[in-house]
């Protein structure tokens, strides 16, 4: 199983531009641009702690790792094969506060092994980022690849729950006690009301992730743990802008992660169980 970071909010296949137009037309303020003033400086004001990021080999996950490490946090970056991720290895060589760990979020033995290695280590922030779009292959009605449904559900929805259940004790021992999942507006019932076509398996997996995190927020409330889903926006992790390819609302990965870090830093008990865009706007479930 190849686990990659969710590289964008919407697919790049033929229905891509239609989906973008529908999203912008129907979501209104939900997809408004820059981070809100209330959260703009939250990350800078938050004392460094320990953060664990899954799916950290590239894209959004790697940018989370880079920014947190540069901000002085103790960072645990996980990937299926971190030793093969050149950018992670090079960053770890420069940053003594960065620890690389092997983790396959769909492999029970891999998760248990990480749980054992991290036993007794408090984690302030757990970011479930690992996920995949499967390049939207076989996700158009009439041409559905039914054998790929289970893959995306296991990786995008079940994987984060596996990891969270294994490490919840570490988070409870941390000071900040925050669990996040990088989701997508593709999994929002409110936004999908605009008629965005195709992408069935990816949408279903992200909708499932949203419900799992919402339910988890209720179960973990008595333990003082905050849980929320994050929408990174339509992120250019593939370098489209550098190649002259533009899409409405496309956002640079650095800006997206800066915004999400601010959201995480400012997350309060009243916001647990919500779906928040990198700009600070609350999204419809």
Task: Enumerate the predicted regions with their spans.
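Catalytic loop of short-chain dehydrogenase/reductase
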Residues: 132-133, 139-153, 172-221
């Amino acid at each position: 199983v190849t686990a990659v970071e969710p590289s964008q909010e919407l697919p790049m296949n033929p229905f891509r531009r239609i989906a973008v137009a529908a999203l912008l037309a129907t979501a209104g303020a939900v997809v408004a641009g820059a981070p809100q003033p209330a959260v703009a400086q939250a990350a800078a004001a938050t004392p460094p702690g320990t953060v664990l990021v899954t799916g950290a080999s590239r894209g959004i996950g790697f940018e989370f790792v880079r920014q947190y490490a540069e901000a002085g946090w103790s960072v645990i970056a996980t990937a299926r094969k971190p030793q093969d991720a050149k950018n992670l290895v090079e960053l770890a060589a420069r940053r003594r506060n960065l620890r690389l760990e092997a983790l396959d979020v769909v492999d029970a033995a891999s998760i248990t092994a990480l749980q054992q290695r991290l036993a007794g280590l408090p984690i302030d922030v757990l970011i479930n980022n690992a996920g995949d779009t499967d390049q939207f292959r076989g996700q158009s009605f009439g041409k559905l690849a039914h054998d790929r449904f289970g893959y995306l559900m296991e990786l995008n929805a079940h994987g984060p729950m596996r990891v969270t259940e294994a490490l919840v004790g570490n988070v409870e021992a941390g000071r900040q006690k925050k669990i996040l999942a990088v989701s997508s507006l593709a999994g929002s019932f409110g936004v999908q009301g605009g008629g965005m076509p195709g992408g069935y398996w990816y949408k279903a997996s992200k909708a499932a992730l949203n419900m799992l995190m919402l339910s988890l927020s209720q179960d973990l409330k008595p333990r003082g743990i905050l849980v929320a889903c994050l929408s990174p926006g339509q992120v250019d992790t593939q370098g489209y802008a550098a190649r002259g390819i533009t899409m409405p609302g496309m956002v640079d990965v650095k800006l997206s992660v800066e915004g999400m870090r601010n959201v995480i830093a400012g997350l309060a008990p009243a916001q647990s169980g919500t779906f928040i865009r990198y700009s600070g706007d609350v999204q419809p479930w």
